[in-house]
Structure formats: C-alpha cells, structure tokens
Amino acid sequence: MNFIITTRDFSNDDSVLRAAEMRDNVAGSISKAYKGTVRAEGKKKLLLKHLPVPPGGCSRRNSNLFVFCTERDYRKFHQGIAQLKRAPAELDPHEIQQVTASIRCRLQPSLREPPTPADELQTAVSRVCALFNQLVFTAQLRHYCEHQDKVVSYARDELTKRCGEKSALGVEVHQLVALLPHERHRELCHVLIGLLHQTPHMWARSIRLIGHLRHYLQNSFLHLLMNSGLDIAQVFDGCYHSEAYRMLFQIGHTDSVSAALELSHGAAAGPPEADENNDEGEEDDDELRHSDPAPLHESKKPRNARRPRTRVPPHEQKPEENEEEEEELFPSCKATAAFLRAEPSVSNDDGNGGERCDTLATALRHRADEEDGPLASQTAVRVAATPSPSVTPALTPVTSPITPLCI
C-alpha cells in the first residue's frame, strides 16, 4: 500500500506567496507577449517600444558597448576581434572561449555575509552585466569575422546558447527581476526579459541596438544602486569612479555627487570669497577692479607673441615610444601574422652578412685601384654586392648588351 504524505502551511501570513506569484505572473505575461510574436523583427520592435530614446540619438558603431566597463577595457577586446579578422589562423575555439570567459564588469559583487537585500541586488546586477558583456563580445565576433569559417560557426553556436530564458543570462535575469518592485521598475523588467527572446541573428546584426540597450541598462542599474543606499566608491573599481560620477551627474543625482565634485574642483578653486557684510572684503574688491589685469596664460596669448617653434630635421627625430604595449588576446594569430609578414632575406652562416659584404667590397676596391685603375674598382664593387645564385630565388635575364672592359 502506498502512503502519500502531504504537508500544509497553517500560517495566516501569505503575503510572501502572493508576492512570488505576482512576480511570476509579471514575468510570465511579458514572456508570453514575446513568444506570441513569430518574426524576429517583431520581437525587436516590441523591445524598442519599451526603450526610451537616448539623449544623443543612435550610438556610434565603434563606441563602447560593454556595461560598466571603461573605454580601455572595451578597446582591449575590440582589438582582439580585429586581430582575428586580420590573421587567417587555425584558431582553437577553446582559446576564444577562454577570452570570452575573462570578460567582466567594473561593478564588484558583494562578499558580505550574511547579505542584505542591497547586497543581493548588487551581486545580481554585477552578474547580469558580466554575462551581457560576454554576449555582446560573441555577437561582435559573429558580425565582424564573417570570412573566418571556424569563428562564424563557433559564434553562431555560442549565441544560441547565451540568449534565451534557459541560458545562464536568463537565470540571472529572472533572479534580478524577482528582487525588483515591479510597480516602479516595470519597464526595466520588460527590457530585461525582452532581450532574452531576441534571436542570434538580431544580436549579430543590430550593433546599434546593443549600444541603445547598454545606455539604458547603465542608467537604470545606477538608479537601482543609488536608491538601495549603496556607495559608488565601494561598489565600483577605482578606475571607474570618475565615469560613474559623470553618469550620475547626467541622470540627475547631483546631490549624491556634490561632495565628489567639490573635491575634484577644490584644487582649481581660488581663495575664499570675502563675506558680504565685511567692509574689508568690499575694499579688496575695489582694489582688484582698479588694479592691472592678471597676465594671460601662454595658451591664451596672441599668436604673434608666442615663442616660435623649432623644427627638428628628420634625421634627428627620435622615434616615439609606446607607453603601453597592446596586449595580444590570441597568441596563435600573432604568430601566424608574423610568419606571413616575414620576407626572405640573404644571410651568411656567421650571422654578420652586412659587415662581411662591406669588408669584401672594400678589399676588392683597394686591390683594383692598385692594379688597374678606378674602372676596375667599380666592377669589383658591383661583383661583391651581387648576391650568390644559390641564395637568390630567381634571376631576371639580362637583355641589355654587355660592354667589354678594356684592361
């Protein structure tokens, strides 16, 4: 006989269950709207319907597309894509997978135990941003490396795995949506769930839409972090503080960044102004009005008064040294490109081909001058400078008549 044991919750407080059901209903209704749209273009238009128009219009194609990343971070991985596009190398897909997995964001996940609701929100936003940046990098691989068959097939499979409700990004998005109050952030929930239903073809072709999404997600996530009471100086890396304060100033959080702006402009500010009720301050102002103006900065002086520039001859110019060397993301592509750029060169066994050739030409010239005169010395130099037939890959036949030498 089979016994079925059932449990029942006898508590009278069911607010938690109602909130969970409401969140599931909201996410389910949004997903149902996208699943009911068959064409990929219709899903894209439905997503654009809930995206506000950015203040600067459409983003540029070469702009930063990573969420909460600096321009240097984005340029590093974008140069890796250009490296794959240039070098026709037999690249292992495992190498691309390692580079993709190393993409993160400058928002740090919370490590506090036990975590508070603000810490859980910070960790969820950080994971969503990192997975979104990895998806953008894979979409750029598919978009720019069209002539690399292996890269195209790898990027197509990765886009299929990374977009969807059952992907890693989909799991993190649903966890983040569960933490948000839907009444206040309904548009953000719609955009987060809507980007999960976009097709791999949309991610590979709509680069400008990715820039639109990046701009909206950054502003919305900053609103969430500031409203939850988190400090920008603690949740972001040090190299991203200035960018975070700039975005906060643009979206209207001027009160939160007033202290940072005062610190940044404190060094450039002049002496403190005198009090309005102080007569000495007024006298100082009168003296300043009647005194001679301060000398102009060198950059603001008239062009005729500037010091003339001295031009350095080309042979005396020093080559510019690169302060930062570009990091190669794919070493195999670098080795292949170096092999293709290599040119055949004439070298001797001792490794000093140039010095040996110069020494031989000098000896033949002196010997010819002593014996037969300057004409023979020119012939000797010409013979010494000619490479040997064993080293030269192909010799062009001489069609001009040979003038005999009279000795």
From Swiss-Prot:
Give start-end of the signal peptide. Answer: none
This protein's record includes keyword Ribosomal protein? no
Region (Disordered) location: 267-330, 388-407
Q: List the disulfide bonds.
A: none
Basic residues compositional bias, start-end: 302-312
Compositional bias of type Basic and acidic residues: which residue ranges? 287-301
Acidic residues composition bias: residue spans? 273-286
Family (UniProt): Belongs to the HHV-5 UL34 protein family.
Annotated function = Acts as a transcriptional repressor of the US3 gene expression through a specific DNA sequence named the transcriptional repressive element (tre).
The name of this protein is Transcriptional regulator UL34
Taxonomic lineage per UniProt? Viruses, Duplodnaviria, Heunggongvirae, Peploviricota, Herviviricetes
